[in-house]
């Protein structure tokens, strides 16, 4: 069962090198505070994360945070909120039952990939974190900043950004 990476763009569009900008477009991170979810074993993902590590932060998302994220920020085509009824109606053909909790469980178990579902938007638009960033947005997480790999502590940041 692969981990599920939550990837958030922290820095804006100014002074981004063309190769990094292209990588961010491939990840669907077009704007600041946009977030995507990919399985950690996705081919080519690790190289893309390393290429864009000075503009993004990422880590493993847990079940509770994923359910809360899907409830508050999940959108369907037509920019309508993601609901339990919608999941039961449109995703039953993928074997997903139990509403948003069932969708979150299927994502974490690797049964489906969010970016492959055509009826749910793969990008989550988040708010800036409540209370602001605790550290510099120009330094790596391990060096006292907010960028790069942060492991399980991504969940605290996501909850502040919902």
Curated annotation (Swiss-Prot):
Output the Gene Ontology terms for molecular function.
Answer: RNA binding; structural constituent of ribosome
User: Which UniProt keywords are given for this protein, alphabetically ordered?
Assistant: Ribonucleoprotein, Ribosomal protein
Instruction: Give the UniProt entry's GO cellular component terms.
Output: cytosolic large ribosomal subunit
- Annotated membrane-spanning segments are none
Alphabetical list of InterPro entries matching this protein? Ribo_uL30_ferredoxin-like_sf (IPR036919), Ribosomal_uL30 (IPR039699), Ribosomal_uL30_arc (IPR005997), Ribosomal_uL30_euk_arc (IPR035808), Ribosomal_uL30_ferredoxin-like (IPR016082)
Q: Which GO terms describe its biological process?
A: maturation of LSU-rRNA from tricistronic rRNA transcript (SSU-rRNA, 5.8S rRNA, LSU-rRNA); translation
Report which superkingdom the organism of origin falls in.
Answer: Archaea
SUPFAM superfamilies to which the protein is assigned, alphabetical: Ribosomal protein L30p/L7e (SSF55129)
| Pfam families linked to this entry | Ribosomal_L30
Q: How does it assemble?
A: Part of the 50S ribosomal subunit.
Q: Which family does it belong to?
A: Belongs to the universal ribosomal protein uL30 family.
Protein name listed in UniProt: Large ribosomal subunit protein uL30
Organism of origin is Staphylothermus marinus (strain ATCC 43588 / DSM 3639 / JCM 9404 / F1)
């Amino acid at each position: 069962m692969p981990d599920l990476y939550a990837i958030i763009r922290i820095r804006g569009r100014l002074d981004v090198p063309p190769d990094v900008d292209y990588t961010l477009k491939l990840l669907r991170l077009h704007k600041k505070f946009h977030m995507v979810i990919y399985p950690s074993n996705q081919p080519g993902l690790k190289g893309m994360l390393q290429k864009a590590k000075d503009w993004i932060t990422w880590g493993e998302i847990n079940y509770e945070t994923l359910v809360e994220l899907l409830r508050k920020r999940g959108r369907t085509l037509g920019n309508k909120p993601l609901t339990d009824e919608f999941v039961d109606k449109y995703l039953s053909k993928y074997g997903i039952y139990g509403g948003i909790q069932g969708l979150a469980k299927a994502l974490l178990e690797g049964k489906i990939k969010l970016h492959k579902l055509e009826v749910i938007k793969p990008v989550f638009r988040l708010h800036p974190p409540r209370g602001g960033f605790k550290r510099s947005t120009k330094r790596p997480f391990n060096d006292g900043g907010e960028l790069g790999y942060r492991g399980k502590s991504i969940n605290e940041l996501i909850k502040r950004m919902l």
